[in-house]
Amino acid sequence: MGSLGMYSESAVRKKSSRGYDVPEGVDIRGRYDEEFARILNKEALLFVADLQRTFRNHIRYSMECRREAKRRYNEGAVPGFDPATKYIRESEWTCASVPPAVADRRVEITGPVERKMIINALNSGAKVFMADFEDALSPNWENLMRGQINLKDAVDGTISFHDKARNKVYKLNDQTAKLFVRPRGWHFAEAHIFIDGEPATGCLVDFGLYFFHNHANFRRSQGQGSGPFFYLPKMEHSREAKIWNSVFERAEKMAGIERGSIRATVLIETLPAVFQMDEILYELRDHSVGLNCGRWDYIFSYVKTFQAHLDRLLPDRVQVGMAQHFMRSYSDLLIRTCHTVVCHVGGMAAQIPIRDDPKANEMALELVRKDKLREAKAGHDGTWAAHPGLIPACMEVFTNSMGNAPNQIRSARRDDAANLTEDDLLQQPRGVRTLEGLRLNTRVGIQYLAAWLTGTGSVPLYNLMEDAATAEISRVQNWQWLKYGVELDGDGLGVRVNKELFARVVEEEMERIEREVGKEKFRKGMYKEACKMFTRQCTAPTLDDFLTLDAYNHIVIHHPRELSRL
């Protein structure tokens, strides 16, 4: 990235006593490793530091705006369309044309930035692989740095993995999926890298290191002259999209590549963002390749946004599917918004194959087919799959629905969704609240968190591939039911959720987890630590914004200067 020569030589030459060569004001507090040092070279760190210094005040202001919005919602306000940006929603404009490299996104596979996962996903037959630094990754130092190494090797085409247990070597096929990378959200700090005495912003570290090392090779090998490509999570307002757009423009300028080269799909996975979709696309119009329904996080956000609204309690989370009016309205408006301004839209399937039960596996695949057929008929251009085994079924549905067309951008404009109102998007979901719902939330939340604390962020549980979104839904729903003493339906009829009932549920579900995973795995794992953390979060007087921020404090390891090379 030759244009970084604009910085002074003295700024680049400072050496860290932890072993890394760092620019002025940068301190690496993670373990020293020679492989990591190739990623964390002084020019790459200078690039990340420049992004941090340029945009930190904008990020800080955006987070203050989030806190102010939360205060208003907790006092009784509800999200809605902004009258001040009505002109954007009602005027005619379009996003930049979709690059040929990503015109066809019928099926996308997602997963963490682990070496074997990257190879298998790129070889899976999907059109796109979203490599995840966010909800599918436990962001300890090793995972983050290995992830950057793995992605660099993947872009270079040199990645391989030797599975010693199976004596099998994994390498890339000639034809691979297009690579997208999802950095963390704006709210997540990177506690192993300090810039000017403050933790760096996690997403700027993820984006900055990946872009710095890979933009040139990516454009040659994957992007057909465009890219790199990204997914952007957890945004709540268009001002946050505006920061991303400015980050992209600065990165393009410093790399000496054409403006609009970087492209990103935004996940609409927070309730406030559904009222900002036009505005988000408008801010990113030169860098956008669409929106995606991040529906699990969207349900989490619904509960979090309405945490103080007794009249908006959710039923059991398994009942909050796309058939619920507020979820269907969200999906329909997202499709209309994207196709009006000529860009992509996608969805998600979390099921995984059930290898030891062919009948159950076929039932699961049939559920996937029905879900994907609904998405295709609604106008989605593609969908996510959490496992390679789902790709043929998903691909078949979208190919049959779209024929030879790579997408439905111009054929499924969804003008019928033009009259969707704020009430449609906020309508309370219907269903029952049961003791089994409380049990499932508790059992899944504890098991996911136990895996996360030991370095695994994508966890197969009960035939679904779960990431942090599931644990978040489980936590906030338990918290809300406890706060308001919800009366249970079904077998728990007349029973109210209180701390005594919850304590009994936790004890019984821990016994069940031990039976299911086995005594040895239970003893060696972090189930007890996860149980304490999950229980504390569910019974806290105030609701934390993110479970992962609390859990992150338990996986951060700062290495003393004198031990950094050990």
UniProtKB/Swiss-Prot annotation:
SUPFAM superfamilies per the UniProt record, alphabetical: Malate synthase G
Position of sequence motif Microbody targeting signal: 564-566
Organism: Cucurbita maxima (Pumpkin)
Domain of life: Eukaryota
The name this protein goes by in its record: Malate synthase, glyoxysomal
NCBIfam families in the record: malate_syn_A
A Pfam match: MS_N
Reactions performed catalytically: glyoxylate + acetyl-CoA + H2O = (S)-malate + CoA + H(+)
GO cellular component: glyoxysome
Enzyme superclass (EC): transferase
EC numbers for this chain: 2.3.3.9
Pathway: Carbohydrate metabolism; glyoxylate cycle; (S)-malate from isocitrate: step 2/2
InterPro entries cross-referenced by the UniProt entry: Malate_synth_C_sf (IPR044856), Malate_synth_sf (IPR011076), Malate_synthA (IPR006252), Malate_synthase_CS (IPR019830), Malate_synthase_TIM (IPR001465), MS_C (IPR048355), MS_N (IPR048356), MS_N_TIM-barrel_dom (IPR046363)
GO molecular function: malate synthase activity
S-S bridge residues: none
